[in-house]
Amino acid sequence: RGQQLVSALTPGITVPADASLLGKAVGNLLSNASRYSPEGAEIRVWCGRLEGRPALSVENTGARISGDALPHLFEAFYREEGSRNRSTGGSGLGLYLVKMILDRHGAVCTIENTEEGVKATVRF
């Protein structure tokens, strides 16, 4: 799809976690960023500290989410109306599972529109 992954990772950031589960959560965020971005879009991954605590973010460019949909994104089977098409697929369970995994790790994920796209931020 010609998308570019750009990362800014702070060395030495660790969290006590089930690496497999946490990998699934982060993988889902990355997959969504790619799936809902156009060809040639930039996907940005950041890892560092926010307010002294470990955090990471995944941000896409070129795609946004309606304000009405934002509060519902982590609900099971929820899909924003515009995302229901054959090219994106999905069951509406991905972000729900992300939330369940992060809850288990004492982490919180927020999703917001930015000037360029959508950013998911995970705070541990």
Regions flagged by a language model, labelled:
Residues 4-13, 50:
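Conserved catalytic submotifs in the C-terminal HATPase_c
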Residues 106-107:
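Conserved glycine-rich
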Residues 33-34:
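Short helix-loop "hinge" at the ATP-lid/N-box region of the Bergerat-fold HATPase_c
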Residues 40-52:
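Short beta-strand/loop element within the Bergerat-fold HATPase_c
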Residues 89, 94, 98:
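Short alpha-helical Gxxx[C/S/T] motif in the catalytic ATP-binding
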